[in-house]
């Protein structure tokens, strides 16, 4: 990625984050297939995961969701991009989507280095990058943006380490139509 694309992405993320924090985003709610959106996000990153020969395990239940489709694409693109970025070559990324009675749960796991305990509390802060992440492209805005979008939908996001290495992100979103963005 060249410097102009990175700068454009940075400016776009700063503006979007600012709008979210000031609640200046028009709430364009539509019903769409969340599983298809996640699948599209993953396929749009195909160049990155094929370059590293990363495999995938994908179990996405069919889920119709009402929310701001454009904003939600930022969630999946950022989480998937990070999973690819921090996964070792020939690693595996696992993603699961399931619908509960009152919520939808998305789980994304990778085989990367995981997250140090002192970092877990700060990874959703603006401009925060863990020491080891400076080797990879990024600006410390992606997860902050993801958190603001999830929060504005009345959902939750958490990051945890997997028992045998790697990281797990869990996003839970309410399915009540009046609470989704």
Task: Please name every model-derived segment.
Residues 115-127:
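Short conserved segment of the HATPase_c
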Residues 48-57:
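Short conserved segments within the C-terminal catalytic ATPase subdomain
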Residues 154-155:
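Conserved glycine-rich
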Residues 2-7:
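Short alpha-helical segment of the dimerization/phosphotransfer core of two-component systems
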Residues 90-102:
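Short beta-strand/loop element within the Bergerat-fold HATPase_c
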Residues 28-46:
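A conserved beta-strand-to-alpha-helix junction within the catalytic ATP-binding
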Residues 83-84:
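Short helix-loop "hinge" at the ATP-lid/N-box region of the Bergerat-fold HATPase_c
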